[in-house]
């Protein structure tokens, strides 16, 4: 059955919910990207080049914490789509919980879908994407999937960087109901990464944004090959998505803060503004909020020289409105008040 869409939206409201957790309000559709609210302890991880290969014990998601954030956002039934860029614990650990609470469908890697099945989500509720897909989300709104890579270096932390997918549904611990969160356990990256290019042909004109939650300058130009299948080089995949969408530039880039990556991506993306994410740490309590302000002189200097405005988040649940005229901050007073961020 074809899905009925409302009129095209004139804007999207974008909320940063910590790490690379984003909340998009696109007309009548609300989208949560990543949505990792549970905080696992740092001392649970060990091994590998990055120190995150294995865990000392399994962990269940913090359902109460996710529920609290969901309720603070209001109208939980509006959350109709969950996206994951990649499938490490700090991105997809709570995806199944959001889906249970909202009934929202999931789009991500095969690994994300298998993780969700382990948590009891029906297989048909999760769509596995490999890159190159153009998916209509709402009237006038298209999301293009860009196969991407993960941060790191194959010579230094291959278990974290190299593309790896799960091949079977992971088994939950019978005592705790939890999964093993290590990147060499139940939470590999899911075949590298998925970036998302959003294009809105709105009531007042066209606008767009690009989201990626990790990247490595080391091999952003090298094809991603998994199980004998070549998924293309990330930079070439981005060029293809931009070309297919008939975009010469985007209005906003949401991504990690790394100067070597920015120097490769900006010439392709030509963003008007940049919103840095995934700079606030992995292990601090969500309720404690941002502990130190964003600062990355290398990125900021390069972007300024390139004519790209830097939109600096200051606190969790900061919110912006993006439309054809650009991006600007808007108040999110009630949500912040409920979560204690005022």
Sequence positions of predicted segments:
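Metallo-beta-lactamase
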Residues: 2-9, 110-205, 316, 333
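Active-site-proximal beta-strand elements of phosphoester/diester hydrolases
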Residues: 13-16, 31-34, 142-149, 207-216, ...
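Active-site neighborhood of phospho(di)ester-bond hydrolases with catalytic His/Asp-centered motifs
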Residues: 32-36, 78-88, 107-110, 209-215, ...
